[in-house]
Amino acid sequence: MAKKTVWSLFDGSGIMGLPWAEYGHTVYCFNASSGNHGEYAGRKEHPLVHHVDMWIDEDFAEKCAAMNIPSPDIIFAFPDCTEIAVSGAKHDSHTSLVSVDNAKMVQEIAEGFGAKWMVENPVGKMSNHWRKPDYYFDPYQYGGYMHGDEESFHSKMPAYDGYTKKTCIWAGGGFVMPEKKPGPVNIGLFWGWRWLGGNSQRTKQLRSLTPRGFARAVFLANRGANQ
C-alpha cells in the first residue's frame, strides 16, 4: 500500500487527518496558534500527525519546501469563515474576502502539486464571492460512519455528530465526495449556536470542529484501492 502525505490547512484540531494517520499515512496540520481560533484544546495527537504552528500565506508552499515537508497527495483546508475583507474592514460592500483568497490559494497550491483538494466552509458569502460550491452536507448525514462512543467535546454535543450545520465543499483534482450515511441521531439544529454563547477562542473552536463522521467518510472515499 503506497503511503500518502496529507496537508490539512487552517486545521488546529487534527480531526480531518486522524483517519489517514491511523492507517499509516503522514499528516501535516497547519494552523497559527496566534490566529483567530487560538491553539486548540484537546487536539488530536498521533505519531503520524504533525501539528505545524505557522501562518498560511502566499508563500506557504515555498516555506513548506524549505522545512523539508513532503509534497502532498491530498490537501484539505478550513479557512476562517469570519467575513473580513482583505482591507481589514468588516465585510459589507467589499468583494474580496480573506476566506476566498485563502480558498483560491489552496486550489492553486494543489494544482501545482497535482494533488486532490477540498475546501470546507459553512454556508456564507464565499459562494457569492468565489463560485458555487460543488457539494453541500450537514454533519448528521455522515453519522453512520461513527460508532457512537466517540469523545464528546461538550455536554450539549450530540452523539454521532447528530446535528445540522449546512456546510459547503469546493473540491477538485479527483477528490471524491463520500456517500452520505446518516446516523441514528439528528437534533435538527446546530448545538454550537444554540448553547454556546460569547466569542471566546474556545467557543470558536467548538463551533468550527470538523464532523468526525465526515472526516472518516472522506478518508474511505479517497484513500485509494486496497487500503
Segments the model singles out, each with a brief description of its role:
Residues 55, 59, 73, 79:
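Extended cationic-aromatic binding surfaces that line active-site or macromolecule-binding grooves
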Residues 1, 14, 226-227:
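Enriched but not universal
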Residues 8-14:
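Class I SAM-dependent methyltransferase "Motif I" SAM/SAH-binding loop
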Residues 9, 31, 63-74, 81-226:
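Class I S-adenosyl-L-methionine
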Residues 15, 36, 143:
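Flexible, glycine-rich phosphate/dinucleotide-binding loops
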